């Protein structure tokens, strides 16, 4: 084939050379995607909720000859890490088995390879100067000491990644055969999973070693894919980053809250369809002029809404996602969530003082306030009470209160409330987004 992907290092000859702050160009050849939309739209959605790559269209010319329309995807490298985590030299891995084994565990983060880190080399690609001991210690905690997991894992970002993968049926990922993700250990010592390789999202890739669909699954089955399949069912090979995390009822409710947010903000309101139309119009002439594309121009025109059949069936994006939204809305944890209303900051906003915060909440059994004083530090969590003893006014009036001790000049905070049915964040994109308060 003429239209191959490209991975170009701009600093290969001149160390430190870059273009607009980027020293690597990764060009995807838009294979497995007749719509030409999957990768760009997926990254745009993901960036609302977690660190994820930027992506756009590129017409690629080589020696003044047009090779075709590509997707230009920001590399997950040291520059990416610096921008999102404020550091770049900590332990950094790619979950990328040297040989993908459809009958094996791949980069599933299980401890099956044993206690010698050498046995993990075939499954994980070390991107930093060191880190095998850190990775093994994390895997050991994930599999054997789950009660300590929050000390080694950014749980919220993990839940967002899983929510994204299951909402958009992005199974060429940790979900399907445990690949195509990164792990970076930030300055807090927490591992952060990072999405990668989204060209087969929206059910372009329909393979998984979840036992319910061992031999693959249809578009109709993708629509009703259970987002807790690796918890509710049997995984042929372990998925501890899902199953062991989902053992917590609270994490399951948080996960479903994130799924709800992704679906309501992008799918239910049809914004993804409108964005698809915009991108389709932007790419139209370039797709028409791409003589090396893998699918026809008619396929490109149709696949936003309708199935295209080639080697496999590629669902239309709206065909898949509108029906998936209807299905997900029926699941436990999607409906029946608490209502979070009025926020009130009580008392003077003075550095070093204690700051009381109240929140009006309906239909909640538990309300949490998460706060921190600096970017990228870990959120501390306080339980809020409606007992008349925590600055909340009258007991039982649905106003919950808590006090943040010895505040700094900047407070970043968010809320989480849950009942037996469902959970709700405020703001809904927390912890990636949060409220900010300046003190005196």
Where are these regions (language model features)?
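Middle-to-C-terminal accessory/interaction subdomains
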Residues: 1, 124-176, 180-354
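Internal "kinase-insert"/substrate-recognition segments embedded within catalytic cores
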Residues: 5-15, 22-30, 48-58, 62-168, ...
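Residues that flank catalytic or metal-binding motifs in active/ligand-binding sites
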Residues: 2-4, 23, 54-56, 65-69, ...
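Aromatic/His-enriched, Gly/Pro-containing loop or helix-boundary segments
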Residues: 26-36, 393-400
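Glycan-association/targeting regions that enable binding to alpha-glucans and other polysaccharides
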Residues: 323-440
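Short acidic-glycine loop/turn motifs at beta-strand connectors
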Residues: 62-64, 186-188, 419-421
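A conserved alpha-helical element in kinase catalytic cores
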Residues: 31-51
């Amino acid at each position: 084939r003429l239209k191959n992907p490209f991975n170009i290092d701009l600093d290969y000859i001149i160390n430190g050379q870059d273009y607009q702050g980027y020293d690597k160009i990764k060009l995807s050849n838009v294979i497995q995607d007749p719509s030409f939309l999957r990768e760009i739209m997926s990254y745009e959605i993901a960036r609302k909720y977690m660190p994820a790559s930027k992506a756009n269209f590129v017409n690629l010319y080589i020696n003044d000859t047009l090779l075709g329309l590509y997707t230009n995807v920001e590399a997950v490298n040291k520059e990416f890490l610096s921008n999102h985590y404020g550091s770049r030299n900590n332990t950094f891995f790619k979950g990328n088995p040297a040989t993908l084994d459809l009958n094996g565990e791949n980069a599933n983060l299980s401890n099956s390879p044993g206690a010698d880190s050498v046995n993990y080399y075939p499954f994980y690609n070390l991107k930093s100067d060191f880190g095998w001991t850190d990775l093994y210690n994390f895997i050991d905690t994930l599999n054997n000491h789950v009660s300590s997991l929050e000390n080694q894992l950014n749980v919220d970002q993990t839940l967002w990644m899983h929510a994204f993968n299951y909402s958009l049926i992005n199974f060429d990922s940790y979900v399907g055969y445990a690949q195509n993700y990164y792990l970076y250990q930030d300055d807090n010592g927490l591992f952060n999973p990072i999405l990668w390789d989204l060209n087969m999202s929206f059910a372009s890739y329909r393979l998984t070693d979840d036992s319910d669909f061992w031999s693959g699954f249809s578009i109709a089955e993708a629509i009703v894919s259970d987002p807790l399949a690796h918890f509710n069912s049997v995984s042929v090979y372990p998925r501890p980053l899902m199953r062991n995390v989902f053992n917590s009822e609270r994490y399951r409710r948080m996960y479903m809250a994130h799924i709800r947010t992704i679906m309501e903000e992008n799918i239910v309101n049809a914004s993804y369809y409108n964005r698809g139309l915009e991108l389709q119009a932007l790419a139209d002439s370039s797709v028409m002029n791409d003589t090396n594309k893998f699918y026809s121009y008619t396929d490109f025109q149709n696949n936003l809404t309708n199935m295209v059949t080639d080697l496999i069936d590629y669902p239309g994006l709206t065909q898949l996602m509108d029906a998936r939204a209807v299905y997900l809305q029926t699941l436990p944890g999607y409906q029946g969530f608490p209502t979070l209303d009025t926020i009130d900051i009580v008392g003077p906003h003075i550095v070093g003082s204690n700051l009381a915060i109240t929140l009006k909440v309906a239909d909640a059994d538990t309300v949490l306030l998460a706060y921190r004083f600096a970017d990228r530090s870990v959120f501390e969590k306080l339980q809020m009470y409606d007992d008349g003893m925590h600055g909340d006014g009258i007991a039982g009036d649905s106003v919950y209160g808590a006090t943040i001790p010895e505040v700094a000049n900047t407070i970043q905070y968010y809320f989480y409330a849950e009942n037996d049915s469902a959970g709700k964040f405020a703001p809904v994109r927390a912890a990636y987004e949060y409220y900010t308060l300046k003190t005196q």
